Amino acid sequence: MLIKVKAKPRSVEEYVKKLGEDFYEVAVKEAPERGRANARIVELLSIYFGIKKDKIKLVAGETSKSKLFQILGEKDQP
C-alpha cells in the first residue's frame, strides 16, 4: 500500500493524523537534518499501523515535506 504523508518537523507534539483514505499528516519533534525527521516519521508510522519499521519504505520526498511511503505486509496480530 502507498500512502502520502505531509511531514511537520520541529513540532511541539508528535502525532499521526489521517486526512484522507491514503493521506496522513505526521508531526515530529525532530529537525529535518541528516534524515532524523524521516526516521522518526517511520517510527511513528510503524506504531500507528502496528508493523515493524523495516516494513515501511520512503519512496519519494526525502528532502520535501510531501512524502510517499510504501507500507509492506499486514498488521501484526496481538
What do these predicted regions represent?
Residues 1-27:
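N-terminal first-folded block
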Residues 8, 29, 59-61:
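Short loop/turn motifs enriched for small/polar and acidic residues
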Residues 15-17, 37, 60:
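Short histidine-centered beta-strand/loop micro-motifs
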